[in-house]
Amino acid sequence: MKKYISVKLQTRNNQPLSDAAMIERSWSLMNESMRAIDLQRRRLRSGEPEDAEFVFRWWVDLQFLIVALRRLRRSAELATRVSTAKSIVADAIKQFDQELPMLQKMRNVGEHIDDYAVDSEKRRHKDVERFSLQVGSFDGTTYEWIGARLNIDEARLASIHLWEAVRSVVKNWPKDSGN
């Protein structure tokens, strides 16, 4: 049986979210992101049906893992909009960023691949040139790409710590929060 925190979501789009609804949305999106992180990590450590024809499936799964990790972080940021949660979650985000300093660069390059593919002046990371976009390695644990390294086990642990920070807010949320 699945357990969910009981907060009524507001249905009118013209009203700002209550604190309880903001925490609920953050928590819901973080749970989704954690599932995606675990899914991508599992796929990276297993054989998949398409592997025989698509030998770079691991590359795509790593790119999806990067997106899921950044989405987890962005989902946690929602909780910082609630004053009673701001400090604990902001500290957890700071720790997440310290544990995964390469994540933003990897996400930026992956998300703005069109700029990097042509060495556009709009690139945030000028050290990343078009020739390095499809050059990297993965040893089953560590992904090396664009001069950065991402250990998928360390990334999962950092994700769990961030998720646990928001979970502590959810667990301590007043039951009669008026929502």
Residue ranges of model-derived segments:
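Amphipathic alpha-helical interface segments
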Residues: 1-99, 125-179
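Histidine-centered, metal-coordinating catalytic motifs and their short helical/loop contexts
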Residues: 97-121
